[in-house]
Amino acid sequence: MSGPHPTGLHRLAETIAARKGADPETSWTAKLLAKGPEKCAEKFGEEAVEAIIEAVKGDRAKLISEAADTLYHLLVMLAARDVTLSDVENELDRREGRSGIEEKASRK
């Protein structure tokens, strides 16, 4: 969590985590998670492609909507593999201050 006032992404991640054990009949998130990590990854990919299409088209409102869907599905996919938003933030913190070229070279 991010301090005393969690961001919207942290609140969403907390909601997704709470729905992991919920009834798939009453929660879309629980239903998606019950289908397994592969289905969650597939949905993330679909939403990412839709965001890319809207970015190319230049429709700002649709891009914002698709970006929100993409972030939701990214968090669901991460939750399906027990990866938290904090885990990802820690990785970003680790990379902070390094050039992208230097960081990418260190992964080879």
UniProtKB/Swiss-Prot annotation:
Task: Give the first-level EC class, as a single word.
Answer: hydrolase
Q: Which reaction does it catalyse?
A: 1-(5-phospho-beta-D-ribosyl)-ATP + H2O = 1-(5-phospho-beta-D-ribosyl)-5'-AMP + diphosphate + H(+)
Alphabetical list of InterPro entries matching this protein: HisE (IPR008179), PRib-ATP_PPHydrolase-like (IPR021130)
Q: Where is the composition biased (Basic and acidic residues)?
A: 91-108
GO CC terms of this entry: cytoplasm
Q: Which SUPFAM superfamilies match?
A: all-alpha NTP pyrophosphatases
Q: Which CDD domains match?
A: NTP-PPase_HisIE_like (cd11534)
Q: Where is this region: Disordered?
A: 88-108
Q: Where in the cell is it found?
A: Cytoplasm
Q: A GO term (biological process) for this protein? A: L-histidine biosynthetic process
Q: Matching Gene3D superfamilies, A to Z? A: MazG-like (1.10.287.1080)
Give the pathway annotation: Amino-acid biosynthesis; L-histidine biosynthesis; L-histidine from 5-phospho-alpha-D-ribose 1-diphosphate: step 2/9
Q: What is its EC number?
A: 3.6.1.31
Tell me the GO molecular function terms.
ATP binding; phosphoribosyl-ATP diphosphatase activity
Q: Does the keyword Iron-sulfur apply?
A: no
Record keywords, A-Z: Amino-acid biosynthesis, ATP-binding, Cytoplasm, Histidine biosynthesis, Hydrolase, Nucleotide-binding
Which top-rank group of organisms is this from? Bacteria
Homology family? Belongs to the PRA-PH family.
Q: Which HAMAP family match?
A: HisE
Protein's name in the database: Phosphoribosyl-ATP pyrophosphatase
Give the originating organism.
Paracoccus denitrificans (strain Pd 1222)
